[in-house]
């Protein structure tokens, strides 16, 4: 196994133990629950987009964790961050359109913030790994 792969797997734990993945999983579940309350005419539009963006955050963290090399892992984490920004935008739209109430919005917003913080920390950790040596 190349040095960068050994470093990647010895420093970063299995994805299920990562706080970023755990928060993202909770966020995905809450996004799916919130989307159920959207109007029928939004179920194949904004509600579906919220579900897919929510799922994408944790799925990309998990998939990136199984990849070889920090550079590839970072790419998946960047995609997870982009999906998180999509979730943030959709929940703001949903609040403004009165599809979700203030309590649901507050809960989802808090989850996106916490997920973002832990995801950013994981990205910094992975960036430190790749800075120490070439990636595969």
Walk through the language-model features, giving the residues of each:
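Amphipathic alpha-helical assembly/interaction segments
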Residues: 1-136
């Amino acid at each position: 196994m190349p040095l960068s792969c050994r470093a990647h797997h010895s420093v970063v734990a299995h994805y299920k133990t990562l706080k970023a993945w755990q928060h993202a999983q909770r966020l995905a579940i809450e996004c799916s629950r919130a989307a159920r309350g959207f109007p029928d005419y939004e179920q194949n539009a904004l509600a579906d987009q919220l579900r897919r963006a929510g799922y994408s955050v944790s799925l990309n963290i998990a998939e990136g964790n199984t990849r070889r090399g920090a550079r590839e892992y970072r790419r998946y984490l960047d995609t997870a961050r982009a999906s998180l920004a999509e979730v943030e935008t959709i929940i703001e739209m949903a609040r403004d359109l009165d599809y979700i109430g203030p309590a649901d919005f507050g809960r989802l917003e808090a989850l996106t913030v916490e997920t973002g913080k832990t995801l950013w920390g994981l990205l910094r950790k992975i960036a430190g790994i790749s800075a120490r040596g070439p990636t595969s």
